[in-house]
């Protein structure tokens, strides 16, 4: 009986004694040195209540460090506004990659400062990064062993004193056009016709009182295997443009003038059709490649070939002064002519001479200086009538 009355009390006292005597070292994270509070039994403290003493609720946390545009209802508008302010080249980058652009001393910013209008110009690229001259991992001596072009850039093969010229090359097509020179140097295909016709029209508009020089080095519409690679009608378009221009057209055979190219040579102004001493001229009839198809298609091609042949003979007769019957008889088979023979046949008038007064001498230094004075260093704006 006595034991039953004393046991609960003793156990309770022993439990409180243990709780009160179990002391922890002092810590800045705890207010007291005791593990359990003396006024509340350890077993009666709920788990949730004890956890609430360690962590603050979400309502008690401060939002001062969050910008106002990202709080509550303004979150969506703030995010969209921030998104619009970010450059497009930041899209898809992580924070580390963005730092490369946003840091003042970033490698991207340092590289961007070096990129100027002058540094990306063609002149700067020619002077500092021209071809094999800038081969990575090689010095000038090593690069010179690999290419003769480096020696030519430096002014020849001998000596180390000669340096590569520090001036950019001229714009050759523009210089030739300024000198009123047109060059036919490939088979007569649509792209060639388009360029030549455009040049003739511009030069005739620019100054119809000055002559136009047409240099020819073309196999015409056929290659060395007598295969058709060009178009006969393209040559007739050039011929009609020559007749249309008010400017006189001086023609020069500077290599070869075969087929339709020989016809264009003969259409130059009489007395100003020249051939180089070792140039060659050849006359041949138009032809079509082997083809197959319906009978009506073959008949149409045959009629087209007859028409092209008639035009060719007619234009040759106009240029040479011979009758169409004689020309038709002469070119039943290809007719090959050297320089003097072409003159005798009436296709040309003389052998080209560097002292010929008909070829105007040009001051290229003055031309370059004149072009540099133009706005933007380029060609002048087109007249209002051509826009």
From Swiss-Prot:
Gene Ontology terms describing biological process: chloroplast organization; proteolysis; RNA processing; rRNA processing
Consequences of knocking out this gene: Variegated leaf phenotype. Slow-growth phenotype, with chlorotic leaves during early development.
Keyword Plastid among UniProt keywords: yes
Region (Disordered): 355-387
Disulfide bonds: none
Transit peptide: 1-41
Gene3D superfamilies hit by this protein: 2-enoyl-CoA Hydratase, Chain A, domain 1
Induction profile: Repressed in darkness. Accumulates during leaf senescence.
Predominant localisation class: plastid
Keyword line: Chloroplast, Plastid, Transit peptide
Record note on quaternary structure: Component of the chloroplastic Clp protease core complex which consist of at least 16 proteins: CLPP4 (3 copies), CLPP5 (3 copies), CLPR4 (2 copies), ClpP1 (1 copy), CLPP6 (1 copy), CLPR2 (1 copy), CLPT1 (1 copy), CLPT2 (1 copy) and 3 copies of CLPP3 and/or CLPR1 and/or CLPR3. The core complex is organized in two heptameric rings, one containing CLPP3,4,5,6 in a 1:2:3:1 ratio and the other CLPP1 and CLPR1,2,3,4 in a 3:1:1:1:1 ratio.
Similarity annotation: Belongs to the peptidase S14 family.
Full protein name: ATP-dependent Clp protease proteolytic subunit-related protein 1, chloroplastic
Species for this entry: Arabidopsis thaliana (Mouse-ear cress)
């Amino acid at each position: 009986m006595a034991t039953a009355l004393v046991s609960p009390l003793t156990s309770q006292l022993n439990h409180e004694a243990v709780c009160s005597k179990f002391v922890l070292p002092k810590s800045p994270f705890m207010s007291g040195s005791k593990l359990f509070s003396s006024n509340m039994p350890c077993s009666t403290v709920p788990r949730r209540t004890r956890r609430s003493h360690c962590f603050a609720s979400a309502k008690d946390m401060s939002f001062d460090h969050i910008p106002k545009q990202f709080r509550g209802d303004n979150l969506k508008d703030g995010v969209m506004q921030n998104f619009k302010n970010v450059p497009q080249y930041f899209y898809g980058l992580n924070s580390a990659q963005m730092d490369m652009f946003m840091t003042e001393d970033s490698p991207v910013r340092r590289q961007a400062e070096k990129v100027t209008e002058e540094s990306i110009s063609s002149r700067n690229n020619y002077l500092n990064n021209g071809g094999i001259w800038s081969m990575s991992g090689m010095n000038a001596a090593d690069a010179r062993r690999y290419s003769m072009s480096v020696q030519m850039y430096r002014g020849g093969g001998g000596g180390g004193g000669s340096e590569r010229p520090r001036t950019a090359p001229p714009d050759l097509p523009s210089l030739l056009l300024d000198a009123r020179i047109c060059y036919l140097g490939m088979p007569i295909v649509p792209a060639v016709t388009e360029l030549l016709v455009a040049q003739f029209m511009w030069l005739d508009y620019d100054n119809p009182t000055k002559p136009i020089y047409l240099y020819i080095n073309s196999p015409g519409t056929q290659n060395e295997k007598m295969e058709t690679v060009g178009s006969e009608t393209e040559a007739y378009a050039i011929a009609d443009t020559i007749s249309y221009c008010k400017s006189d057209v001086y023609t020069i055979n500077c290599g070869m003038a075969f087929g339709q190219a020989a016809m264009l040579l003969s259409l130059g102004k009489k007395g100003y059709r020249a051939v180089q001493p070792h140039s060659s001229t050849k006359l041949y009839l138009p032809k079509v490649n082997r083809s197959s198809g319906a009978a009506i298609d073959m008949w149409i091609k045959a009629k087209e070939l007859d028409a092209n042949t008639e035009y060719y003979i007619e234009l040759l007769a106009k240029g040479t002064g011979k009758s169409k019957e004689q020309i038709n008889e002469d070119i039943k088979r290809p007719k090959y002519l050297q320089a003097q023979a072409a003159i005798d046949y009436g296709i040309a008038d003389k052998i080209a001479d560097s002292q010929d007064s008909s070829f105007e001498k040009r001051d290229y230094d003055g031309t370059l200086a004149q072009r540099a004075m133009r706005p933007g260093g380029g060609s002048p704006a087109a007249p209002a009538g051509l826009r």
